Each structure stands twice: as structure tokens, then as C-alpha cells.
Amino acid sequence: KYLLQIIMENSGFFKRIFSLVYDSLLILGIIFSLTLLLVFLNGGAPENGGIIDLLQLFVTIFSGPIFYSYFWLVNDGQTVGMQAWKIKLISEEKLTIRICLLRCAFSTFSFLFFGLGYLYIFFNEEKKSLADLATKTRIAKIN
């Protein structure tokens, strides 16, 4: 298994972005569902400054990292979007929650800065993003 991971070719920019869009739609659905639950628990009334607002903030901020970390750790380095686009996360070390969360943080910041972390793939010979380099991981094509 490890030898196969070494010889897998790294995924390019577009497969990663299409996978990201696919996963983002799923995460958006999760956020909407949890928001609906919070509104229901609050009796359907909007409340400013209460515990419901704090829970909503938590749901909005942490749904993505929890989604990605869960699938990467439990599903052999693949989210649903990654499965659809036949790519997977491979780590030089054993994949841990720390690596997953760091990767999410680097990916988020690189996206917020005009996608520079992802655009770096075009200039990197190994097709690695800045998040890949920072976390000693890579996104590889699978057959």
C-alpha cells in the first residue's frame, strides 16, 4: 500500500477545485440543516446575542474543518468530492487530527488571499499547494 502511494501522481489544480466545490455544497447543506435545528430549538424566533448565536457561529466556522478531518481520517484520505474526482490525501507521516486541522487552516487562509495557495500548484513542479508543503501532505490521483 505504501509503495503505491509513493508512485501516485499528484493531482492538478482543476480536480482539486472541482472536488472542493462538490464538498462545499455538502458542507453548506450541513450548515443549513444545523441552522434549521438551532432555529427550531430557539422556538423559531431570531435572538441576538444569545447562546443560539454562539452555536450558529460555531457551526459556521467549524463545519468545514470537522467535515474534512472526519473524512480524511475515517475514509482513507478521501472526502465525498475527492472520491467523485478520484483523488485522495496522502501524508508523509501518519495522518492525524493535527495535520488535518492544520491543512484546513492553511487551505482557508490561502483561499482568502485570492487563492494564492492553490494557484501555487501551477508554479510548483510537483503540483503541490502551499497547504501541501506546510503539512507534508499531497493530493494524489487514484485509478
Residue ranges and their predicted role:
Residues 2-143:
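Membrane-interfacial and juxtamembrane segments of integral membrane proteins
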